[in-house]
Amino acid sequence: MQPFISHTGLAVIIDSANVDTDQIIPKQFLSKVTRDGFGVHLFHDWRYLDDAGDQLNPDFTLNKPRYQGASILVSQENFGCGSSREHAPWALADFGLKVIIAPSFADIFYGNSINNGLLPVRLADAEVKQLMAEVEAKEGAEISVDLQALTVTSPSGSQFHFEIAQSARHNLLNGLDAIGLTLSHADTIANYEANIPSWRR
């Protein structure tokens, strides 16, 4: 997992509340267990007019030319609700998104995102609405997110503070998923195992 320090990127809006995991990555695409290749199926039922995924829906935000290459998604409350599926952050990341900004997230999705290097940022509803208005008003609008400073900077330069658990922040800054975090304590684990009495092994 790559460390996340800060990121500035083109922002895209999905102005909907309760975007659930079945909308993010529909169940028919969950047969793979590797993380790659899910981006093409992201928001499948919204992005495409046909089941095969051959005909793009020109009215869907992510398909509009001005948002091509977007790496920051701004949405409404309770993003990532619904069934638990790690494929949801996989699909968002594989599409090229680095940050999701919303007033609130479903708890399981929030944790899965952090564990997969995707930064979920909670901001106040008014701050999210301001970001959406600024992004909508100017083509090519970029947002900056600084995990070290815990700030989000809007296209106009307004700065908002966000909070994240210190453990999650540490793992993202250092590029540590659950396995990486365990391996970072390899010497301590080995020392503990070496000192276990033989009768306990």
From Swiss-Prot:
Q: Which CDD domains match?
A: IPMI_Swivel
Q: What's a GO biological-process term for it?
A: L-leucine biosynthetic process
What InterPro entries does the database record attribute to this sequence? 3-IsopropMal_deHydase_ssu, Aconitase/3IPM_dehydase_swvl, AconitaseA/IPMdHydase_ssu_swvl, IPMI_Swivel, LeuD
Enzyme Commission designation: 4.2.1.33
A single Gene Ontology CC annotation of this entry is: 3-isopropylmalate dehydratase complex
Q: Which UniProt keywords apply?
A: Amino-acid biosynthesis, Branched-chain amino acid biosynthesis, Leucine biosynthesis, Lyase
What are the protein's GO molecular function terms?
3-isopropylmalate dehydratase activity
The reaction(s) annotated as catalysed by this protein in its Swiss-Prot or TrEMBL entry are:
(2R,3S)-3-isopropylmalate = (2S)-2-isopropylmalate
* Taxonomic superkingdom: Bacteria
Could you tell me which pathway this protein works in? Answer: Amino-acid biosynthesis; L-leucine biosynthesis; L-leucine from 3-methyl-2-oxobutanoate: step 2/4
Coiled-coil region(s): none
Q: Does the keyword Lyase apply?
A: yes
- Family, similarity comment: Belongs to the LeuD family. LeuD type 1 subfamily.
Entries under HAMAP family matching the protein: LeuD_type1
Task: Spell out the subunit comment.
Answer: Heterodimer of LeuC and LeuD.
Outline what the protein does. Answer: Catalyzes the isomerization between 2-isopropylmalate and 3-isopropylmalate, via the formation of 2-isopropylmaleate.
Q: Which NCBIfam families match?
A: leuD, PRK01641.1
Name of the featured protein: 3-isopropylmalate dehydratase small subunit
State the organism of origin: Shewanella pealeana (strain ATCC 700345 / ANG-SQ1)
**What taxonomic ancestry is recorded?**
Bacteria, Pseudomonadati, Pseudomonadota, Gammaproteobacteria, Alteromonadales
